[in-house]
């Protein structure tokens, strides 16, 4: 409610999280004596975001705070909110020069995300492995952030900026790489078989 010039959309797949967010939003706007006219919240799977937000919506900034790290195994990584396939999906509605603010307590997720962002067409403009050491003025501490900090876990954060142009994306889906390898092997086998018949 401090920035009435901005519109906000809060998305989570968990209704419990959204109910708490709704209560906090209502309390903040009531305390400010303002109607809730620039905030919406919704429950959806972020992997289906392209059905919710379109390029015409022109999003300037995305905040990804303490998302599920999906660390069980390599195959679960594809569900990460910072996995390249997802970061590329955000590019469709994030305007050129738009930013993603990302915070996490998870070391593995952060380390991998530092690689995901550049491969997905983003420049990492700011990064820290201890957000509270020199806490920036823009940081708004979340409940999860407070909980992890009390446990002695350092909060990692970065700001990434979308590069213009599709050619800035260098990531290739592993399924595509596997298919290309199969096709190349089949073509080579066919060529060798053809040479044997001559």
Go through each PLM region and give its residues.
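A short glycine-rich, Lys/Arg-flanked "PGG" loop and its adjoining helix->strand segment in the class I
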Residues: 78-99
């Amino acid at each position: 409610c401090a920035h009435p010039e901005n519109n906000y959309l809060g998305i989570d797949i968990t209704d419990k999280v959204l109910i708490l967010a709704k209560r906090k939003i209502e309390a903040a706007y009531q305390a400010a004596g303002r109607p809730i006219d620039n905030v919406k919240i919704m429950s959806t799977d972020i992997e289906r975001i392209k059905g919710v937000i379109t390029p015409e919506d022109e999003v300037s900034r995305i905040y990804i705070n303490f998302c599920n790290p999906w660390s069980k195994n390599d195959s679960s990584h594809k569900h990460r909110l910072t996995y390249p396939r997802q970061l590329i999906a955000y590019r469709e509605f994030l305007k050129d020069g738009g930013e993603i603010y990302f915070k996490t307590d998870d070391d593995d997720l952060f380390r991998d995300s530092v690689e995901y962002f550049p491969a997905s067409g983003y420049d990492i403009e700011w990064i820290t492995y201890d957000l509270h050491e020199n806490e920036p003025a823009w940081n708004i501490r979340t409940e999860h952030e407070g909980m992890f900090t009390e446990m002695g876990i350092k909060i990692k954060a970065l700001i990434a900026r979308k590069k213009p142009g599709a050619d800035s994306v260098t990531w290739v889906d592993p399924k595509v790489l596997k298919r290309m390898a199969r096709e190349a092997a089949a073509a080579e086998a066919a060529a060798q078989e053809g040479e044997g018949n001559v």
